[in-house]
Amino acid sequence: MNTEATHDQNEALTTGARLRNAREQLGLSQQAVAERLCLKVSTVRDIEEDKAPADLASTFLRGYIRSYARLVHIPEEELLPGLEKQAPLRAAKVAPMQSFSLGKRRKKRDGWLMTFTWLVLFVVIGLSGAWWWQDHKAQQEEITTMADQSSAELSSNSEQGQSVPLNTSTTTDPATTSTPPASVDTTATNTQTPAVTAPAPAVDPQQNAVVSPSQANVDTAATPAPTATTTPDGAAPLPTDQAGVTTPAADPNALVMNFTADCWLEVTDATGKKLFSGMQRKDGNLNLTGQAPYKLKIGAPAAVQIQYQGKPVDLSRFIRTNQVARLTLNAEQSPAQ
């Protein structure tokens, strides 16, 4: 009967009261239990008063009660009914996983961003290519028109050049009619001064071309053949022949161009006169003089080297852009666009 009464009394007590009674029977304080279980004194007090801390999960609370029961030698099976009431198991609230959906949404947004970026890049590349093609096509058309104009000018100049000998033949007739009296005088002077006429054969080919009509007139004046060969012009025309042999002074405004490849070129001076317009071949040289400033149009700036007033002209800005060079060379050698 005493055993049954004790069992009924234990069932009437709560879990916290049974743990407190067992602790007091063993002579332990709450501080000693807290130190052995590595818990706070407040946690031990809450367990004995059957309080469930709000910040403590039920799983941890059930574990603390079991450890407390083993410490005070109370079987765990006797405490299970009380544990279900004091610390019932509560399902933890788990937030729905959103990482996958967030990652999917972020990936979709990144996909749109990359698509827009590639679209902008393709548009920029397309516009750049169209601009380059239009500029290149315009340059080619301009070079073609310049070449056509130069060919037309060259053809007109060649037609005018063919009619020049007809005019020169008419102008030389009075000269031939007026030379016989002069030939008589030259024969007389040549007989008196043979030493003066000795260096006459050393004259340049251009002088020989001019003297040939007078020599023909000397032959028609019934003079002997030896005297005709030793009497080119006499003593009087000798200073003019020597003046023709002397080289003229170099023009300070001379424009010298050397070509490393085929290049179309047009040069105009200050008076509007075209000093040159046409195509220059590789390894060609061109020396032009006129009234400064000069206006130049060069189809291939990389194929020509220009010297003005003895100094090279910088064409690097036209070579870098690969454009037709349009520049003006002033008297101070300052090329301007």
Swiss-Prot record:
Function summary: Cytoskeletal protein that is involved in cell-shape control through regulation of the length of the long axis.
Keywords for the protein's UniProt record, in alphabetical order: Cell inner membrane, Cell membrane, Cell shape, DNA-binding, Membrane, Signal-anchor, Transmembrane, Transmembrane helix
Primary residence: membrane
Biased composition (Low complexity): 168-207, 219-237
PANTHER family per UniProt: CYTOSKELETON PROTEIN RODZ, PTHR34475
UniProt subcellular location: Cell inner membrane
CDD domains: HTH_XRE
DNA-binding region boundaries: 30-49
Segments in the Cytoplasmic topological domain: 1-111
Pfam families: HTH_25, RodZ_C
HAMAP family for this protein: RodZ
A GO CC annotation given for this chain: plasma membrane
Organism, scientific name: Escherichia coli (strain 55989 / EAEC)
Membrane-spanning ranges: 112-132
GO BP: regulation of cell shape
Keyword Ribosomal protein attributed: no
Name recorded for this polypeptide: Cytoskeleton protein RodZ
Biased composition (Polar residues): 145-167, 208-218
